[in-house]
Amino acid sequence: MPTAVLSNQTAFESYTGIDLSMDMPMIAAEWKKRKVSFDGIYTGYLSGVSQVEWVEQFMQEFANPQTKIFVDPVLGDEGVYYRGFGDEMCQAMKKLCGKADVITPNLTEVLFLLGKKADLKAESQNLEQIRSYEKQLSQLGPKTVIITGVSQGEKIWNIGYSAKEDSFFEVSTQKTGEGYSGTGDILTSVICGCMIKGESPQKALKKAAAFLQASIEEAVEDKTDPNEGVAFEHHLSLLFD
């Protein structure tokens, strides 16, 4: 479902775009006529509260008991909200997380969703503390919580929690290069695809992290502008067993 069309991603010095909020109901109506169904529904950036509320309605209409729902609760990064977002958007996203099977927030988003100050000092990134945050987030409703991109020394950690099994799983990779745009989107997209194929969250996260690491290493070697993202296309074979 297209929610907006952008000329380029928003980290560049300028961009233009078209909000498709008014078109989304018409697209959904056409899909409903054709009895479209989905193995998975995956939400990423949503432009505001009204889009979040509409997506909830979309899930009610199009999800069936077998549909896996993934929510990447895009709210902010580096301790601050993205432009135009605030507490109202956070509350709407919190409600949406309650509809999900899997959520994949970064640490800033975790703290916002839990109503905490977004302090990203070392004590906030203690791995034991993060595991406790995951348990708290699971109480919103998702079966699996994966907190992404946690920086610890020379490592980047992605830490998962299965509410059903009351167990944690995690993958760390070497910190490489600068922060590249779109890496969180790639990680969640691979997790989503793998789990819809029937793979476990643990295997999906491991595969996604390895794929992303290889893509970042190529971007570093090629001296790619971080705003351009990473060259993931050359590494798609890593996603196939």
Please place each PLM-identified region on the residue numbering.
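Conserved N-terminal subdomain of the carbohydrate kinase-like
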Residues: 1-71, 75-83, 234-237
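Active-site-proximal loop/turn and secondary-structure-junction residues that shape catalytic pockets
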Residues: 47, 75-77, 109, 151, ...
